[in-house]
């Protein structure tokens, strides 16, 4: 009998009812909520006269609609209603949640790990696709719909069909100036945005082992842009060190680690599909089009039109053409933030490049820490001063310009170097043009006024 993957082990431990191949009822260890996908779910509970089954396993924060310039001055009526409704709901149903502007408030996929709630062995859900971020800790983590949010609130369970298993091995040692954001963008560019459909992806290889927990979260975060249901990694000493000492870390930590150490894939585990990517010669990545798969290594020419891949429409929307390169893009905005790349390490990498320099004329740059703990830590290190002295705006935590649901929208027809995860049409604002890249690439572009090879700077 062959061994099991970490995904198999975790899934099987949480099955309450049902057979493999059909919907199975899973127990949920942590349910994280925010203001956008929870209002209808709470109203459903209210209408049915139900309560939240496990308030202690539920946790909320505000992120999507929160303004980052003046957090309490919410001009948009829908945004204000969602924030006010969330605050009312968590109070009424007795759910632990970060207050608007509170000490732990931030992007949902950042505050769960930072508080120590995210741990190996858990199944974690949230009404948000990038919940997969938590998989970096050796957890099953995936996004759910609003009706499922209500079901989990009421029962602490969810019905799911078990995905297939995919292993992706990142091999080699990257060059200086190449980061985990480049790993995942390269993977999506090579295999496509639907290559992971129907799979739970396990990331492995020496290139993964070498990454920090923050860098690992970046990769798991963008599993969704690869098309996967979720992404996860085997826990190791870096995982345990990250969790240790945090507010909600296990009280008997050594005992917890002894259990977590068993939650790794067996050497003879079987996968439905295996992919490999050598990162040793990988160059910094930049997207040119309107999905994350439309990306290239810096210096490569934009491809010829391929109607099967919607290239013609992408070129029209982005106002670019085949044969150009990333350095030809006329940038107007720089956004360093989002649940993909707004952690302390991301800000530190960007600040190293920015320090002593100034943002190029004609550019607008905003830096948005992903959470209040990150903001405080960055300010203690003086990173805020580095960015402000260079001409950047230093903002309050939130989802910000990752998506057009708050005031931080990129103006129409303006090209933005963005550390976020999606470059769809209108994602950052009506007719905004998004180019995904690492924080270091965004910082280098801010100084130069255009995309440059950050390997020549770091």
Curated annotation (Swiss-Prot):
Name of this protein: 3-isopropylmalate dehydratase large subunit
PROSITE patterns: ACONITASE_1, ACONITASE_2
CDD domains the UniProt entry points to: IPMI
Pfam families attached to this UniProt entry: Aconitase
Obligatory cofactor(s): [4Fe-4S] cluster
PANTHER family attached to this UniProt entry: 3-ISOPROPYLMALATE DEHYDRATASE, HOMOACONITASE, MITOCHONDRIAL-RELATED
Source organism: Lactococcus lactis subsp. cremoris (strain MG1363)
Transmembrane residue ranges: none
Disulfide bonds: none
Functional note: Catalyzes the isomerization between 2-isopropylmalate and 3-isopropylmalate, via the formation of 2-isopropylmaleate.
């Amino acid at each position: 009998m062959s061994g099991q993957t970490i995904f198999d082990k975790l899934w099987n431990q949480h099955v309450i009812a049902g057979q493999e191949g059909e919907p199975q009822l899973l127990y949920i260890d942590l349910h994280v909520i925010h203001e956008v996908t929870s209002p209808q779910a709470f109203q459903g509970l209210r209408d049915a006269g139900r309560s939240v089954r496990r308030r202690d396993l539920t946790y909320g924060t505000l992120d999507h609609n929160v303004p980052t310039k003046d957090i309490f001055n919410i001009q948009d009526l829908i945004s204000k209603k969602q924030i006010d409704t969330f605050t009312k709901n968590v109070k009424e149903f007795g759910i632990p949640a970060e207050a608007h502007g509170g000490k732990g408030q931030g992007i949902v996929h950042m505050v769960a790990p930072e508080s120590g709630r995210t741990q190996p062995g858990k199944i974690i859900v949230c009404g948000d696709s990038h919940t997969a971020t938590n998989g970096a800790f050796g957890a099953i983590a995936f996004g759910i719909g609003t009706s499922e949010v209500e079901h989990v609130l009421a029962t602490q369970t969810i019905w799911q069909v078990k995905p297939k298993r995919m292993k992706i091995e990142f091999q080699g040692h990257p060059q200086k100036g190449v980061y985990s954001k480049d790993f995942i963008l390269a993977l999506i560019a090579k295999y496509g945005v639907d290559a992971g459909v129907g799979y739970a992806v396990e990331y492995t290889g020496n290139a993964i082992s070498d990454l920090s927990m923050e860098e690992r979260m970046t990769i798991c975060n963008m599993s969704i842009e690869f098309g996967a249901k979720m992404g996860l990694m085997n826990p190791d000493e870096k995982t345990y060190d990250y969790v240790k000492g945090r507010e909600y870390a296990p009280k008997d930590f050594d005992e917890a680690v002894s259990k977590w150490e068993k939650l790794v894939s067996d050497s003879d585990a079987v996968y439905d599909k295996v992919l490999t990517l050598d990162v040793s010669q990988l160059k910094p990545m930049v997207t040119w089009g309107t999905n994350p798969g439309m990306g290239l290594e810096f210096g490569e020419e934009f491809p010829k039109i391929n109607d099967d891949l919607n290239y013609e429409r992408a070129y029209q929307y982005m106002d670019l053409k085949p044969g150009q390169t990333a350095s030809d893009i006329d940038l107007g905005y720089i956004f360093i933030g989002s649940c993909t790349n707004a952690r302390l390490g991301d800000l530190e990498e960007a600040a190293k490049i920015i320090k002593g320099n100034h943002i190029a004329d004609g550019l607008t740059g905003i830096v948005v820490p992903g959470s209040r703990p990150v903001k405080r830590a960055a300010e203690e290190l003086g990173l805020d001063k580095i960015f402000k002295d260079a001409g950047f705006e230093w903002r309050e935590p939130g989802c910000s310009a990752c998506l057009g649901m708050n005031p931080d929208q990129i103006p129409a027809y303006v090209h933005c170097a963005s550390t976020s995860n999606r470059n769809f049409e209108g994602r950052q604002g009506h007719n905004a043009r998004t180019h995904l890249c690492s924080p270091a690439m965004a910082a280098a572009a801010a100084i130069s006024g255009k995309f440059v090879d950050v390997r020549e700077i770091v």
